[in-house]
């Protein structure tokens, strides 16, 4: 009997790619999403998941639901017997979190507390949580390993991820029957090789690569580069970009780990290589054959100069390594953008 996995926020960018990998690995994903950051499409399914069904030839069970809706969550857990929960649902824009801290704390913290309480009540004590490298704050050393201090976060989004990590750690400490894998993502980019699913930000992209690809396709005039006076090789910010398919596969490895009764484990998911903004622009120009105009503007509050992972622990304990490099990330991102110039709203 295939094992059921609840995926919260599963219609979003990382969620939809993970649902695809779950199906390929033989799991039965049940997806909930409130469409805050997902495209509705015409049918009963979010467009991203409709396409996942097409790609895999398997059906996806989906319910429109907000994790703040306690009654709906209760009904869901009564209806299904879940082996584990992969928890993506949450607000995720750094800049917006500075403007709207209460929204971020309400959705991310209250939503997660409710989810954990309902999991506990139904005896579902296996969790994969999508955390973030933002929990490290300003790096004290590089590359960042899991032992690097956390909590010196520069914005409410990062703080909310840090607080949730602490809650889950405390829960696993108090009750040894809980197992949790906390995955600290670095900077996901790229898209599925088919070009059928990818990142489709609602509104102006907050992240570099979707913005760059929208400039390349002509949706936006020029890229703003936030600061070129950082202490890096070319003065622009350096980040660890990871292919979203590699990231999604990390969640399958995390589910396997849960079966070992692992307690609470924490892993970086990154490549271990940092690239600057200008290196990413050049790589995207190469992949797309387009010139990408940019202008340098003031630094963005809360941005750090450089941030990249030491991913060796995930390799040792999860058997997971990022396999897809920079050129592949950009080629796949460009294929998605070219086939879907308006994102999921593009009519075939």
UniProtKB/Swiss-Prot annotation:
Name of a matching Pfam family: GDP_Man_Dehyd
Function in brief: Catalyzes two distinct but analogous reactions: the reversible epimerization of UDP-glucose to UDP-galactose and the reversible epimerization of UDP-N-acetylglucosamine to UDP-N-acetylgalactosamine. The reaction with UDP-Gal plays a critical role in the Leloir pathway of galactose catabolism in which galactose is converted to the glycolytic intermediate glucose 6-phosphate. It contributes to the catabolism of dietary galactose and enables the endogenous biosynthesis of both UDP-Gal and UDP-GalNAc when exogenous sources are limited.
List of residues binding NAD(+): 12-14, 33-37, 66-67, 88, 92, 161, 185
Organism: Pongo abelii (Sumatran orangutan)
EC class (word): isomerase
Cofactor entry: NAD(+)
InterPro entries in alphabetical order: NAD(P)-bd_dom (IPR016040), NAD(P)-bd_dom_sf (IPR036291), UDP_G4E (IPR005886)
Highest classification ranks of the organism: Eukaryota, Metazoa, Chordata, Craniata, Vertebrata
Binding site for substrate: 132-134, 185-187, 206-208, 224-226, 239, 300-303
Assembly information from the UniProt record: Homodimer.
EC number per UniProt: 5.1.3.2, 5.1.3.7
Classification via Gene3D superfamilies: NAD(P)-binding Rossmann-like Domain (3.40.50.720), UDP-galactose 4-epimerase, domain 1 (3.90.25.10)
Domain of life: Eukaryota
SUPFAM superfamilies tied to this protein: NAD(P)-binding Rossmann-fold domains
Catalytically driven reaction(s): UDP-alpha-D-glucose = UDP-alpha-D-galactose; UDP-N-acetyl-alpha-D-glucosamine = UDP-N-acetyl-alpha-D-galactosamine
GO process terms (BP): galactose catabolic process via UDP-galactose, Leloir pathway
Official protein name in the record: UDP-glucose 4-epimerase
Signal peptide region: none
Entry annotation: catalytic residues: 157 (proton acceptor)
Keywords: Carbohydrate metabolism, Galactose metabolism, Isomerase, NAD
Listed transmembrane segments: none
UniProt similarity note: Belongs to the NAD(P)-dependent epimerase/dehydratase family.
Gene Ontology cellular component terms for the protein in this record: cytosol
Molecular function terms from GO: UDP-glucose 4-epimerase activity; UDP-N-acetylglucosamine 4-epimerase activity
Functional pathway: Carbohydrate metabolism; galactose metabolism
């Amino acid at each position: 009997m295939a094992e059921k996995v609840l995926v919260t926020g599963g219609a979003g960018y990382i969620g939809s790619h993970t649902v695809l990998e779950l199906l390929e690995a033989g799991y039965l994903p049940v997806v909930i999403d409130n469409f805050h950051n997902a495209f509705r499409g015409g049918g009963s399914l979010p467009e991203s998941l409709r396409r996942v069904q097409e790609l895999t030839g398997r059906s996806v069970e989906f319910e429109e639901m907000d994790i703040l809706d306690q009654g709906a969550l209760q009904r869901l857990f009564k209806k299904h017997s879940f082996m584990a929960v992969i928890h993506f649902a949450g607000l995720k824009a750094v800049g917006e979190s500075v403007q709207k801290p209460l929204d971020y704390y309400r959705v991310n913290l209250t939503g997660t507390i409710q989810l954990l309480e309902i999991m506990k009540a139904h005896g579902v004590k296996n969790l994969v949580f999508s955390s973030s490298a933002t929990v490290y704050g300003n790096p004290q050393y590089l590359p960042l390993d899991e032992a690097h201090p956390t909590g010196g976060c520069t914005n409410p989004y990062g703080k909310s991820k840090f607080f949730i990590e602490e809650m889950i750690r405390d829960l696993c400490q108090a009750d040894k029957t809980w197992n949790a894998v906390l995955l600290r993502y670095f900077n996901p980019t790229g898209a599925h090789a088919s070009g059928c699913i990818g990142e489709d930000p609602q509104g102006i992209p907050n992240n570099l690569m979707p913005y760059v690809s929208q400039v390349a396709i002509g949706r936006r005039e020029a890229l703003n580069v936030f600061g070129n006076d950082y202490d890096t090789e070319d003065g622009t910010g350096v980040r660890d970009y990871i292919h979203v398919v590699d990231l999604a596969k990390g969640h399958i490895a995390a589910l396997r780990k849960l079966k070992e009764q692992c307690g609470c484990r924490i892993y970086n998911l990154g490549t271990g290589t940092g690239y600057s903004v200008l290196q990413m622009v050049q790589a995207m120009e190469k992949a797309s054959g387009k010139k990408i105009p940019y202008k340098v503007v003031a630094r963005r509050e809360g941005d750090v100069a450089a941030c990249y992972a030491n991913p060796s622990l995930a390799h040792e304990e999860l058997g997971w390594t990022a396999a897809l490099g920079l050129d592949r990330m950009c080629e796949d991102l460009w294929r998605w953008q070219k086939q879907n110039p308006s994102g999921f709203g593009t009519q075939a």
